[in-house]
Amino acid sequence: MFFNKKNNQDELKKLAATEAAKSITTEITLGVGTGSTVGFLIEELVNYRDKIKTVVSSSEDSTRKLKALGFDVVDLNYAGEIDLYIDGADECNNHKELIKGGGAALTREKICVAAAKKFICIIDESKKVNTLGNFPLPIEVIPMARSYVARQIVKLGGQPVYREQTITDNGNVILDVYNLKIDNPLKLETELNQITGVVTNGIFALKPADTVIMATKDSNIVVL
């Protein structure tokens, strides 16, 4: 019997997403994130359609998927405050601080987190780490500032790599930063955001997850 790692990971992502959906309450304004784990959440939302008053999406990709299932997606400017925002992460530490942005939607995701009363992060066990930084840190950058920002990141000890053929939903570019050991996520998030030309970076420490729902390799759910 062959062990298919991808299929098993997909099952865990679906397990975490299904568990998170149980937090959906009646007349809720729901924020929906971006990425492969959220893809399973979107599929699960059809079972909660009667409870959802309004849906806000963090990316054009998620908006397309939601509309394909018959959901009306509302701009955050009209929705106001989000009751619950559910999203995945590329890494999560013991303090529920995250690295996000592998799908290049980090700025809109960070806006949704800021506007949400509660943020639930859904992950499989492979995303849990002691120290953030193994996954390259995405930074959204104004295009004309790309080289300047890259030079400033080098001064901080990082190795920036331009993510080619990627334009964010906001019309910007992504630098993925390698070789950063992020011992103080809060400090680095603030420091990077102060570089002129940076829109935002993928550290979520100023507003970490309120709750993390993690599916373990033995198909159990752990709530952090």
UniProtKB/Swiss-Prot annotation:
GO biological process terms on file: D-ribose metabolic process; pentose-phosphate shunt, non-oxidative branch
Species classification: Bacteria, Pseudomonadati, Pseudomonadota, Gammaproteobacteria, Thiotrichales
Originating gene: rpiA
Keywords for this protein: Isomerase
Organism per entry: Francisella tularensis subsp. novicida (strain U112)
Pathway(s) per entry: Carbohydrate degradation; pentose phosphate pathway; D-ribose 5-phosphate from D-ribulose 5-phosphate (non-oxidative stage): step 1/1
Known role: Catalyzes the reversible conversion of ribose-5-phosphate to ribulose 5-phosphate.
Catalysis: reaction(s): aldehydo-D-ribose 5-phosphate = D-ribulose 5-phosphate
Any one Gene Ontology cellular component term annotated for this protein: cytosol
Molecular-function annotations in GO: ribose-5-phosphate isomerase activity
Top-level division of the source organism's lineage: Bacteria
Protein name in UniProt: Ribose-5-phosphate isomerase A
Family assignment from sequence similarity: Belongs to the ribose 5-phosphate isomerase family.
Binding site for substrate: 34-37, 87-90, 100-103, 127
Active site annotation, chain numbering: 109
EC number: 5.3.1.6
Subunit structure: Homodimer.
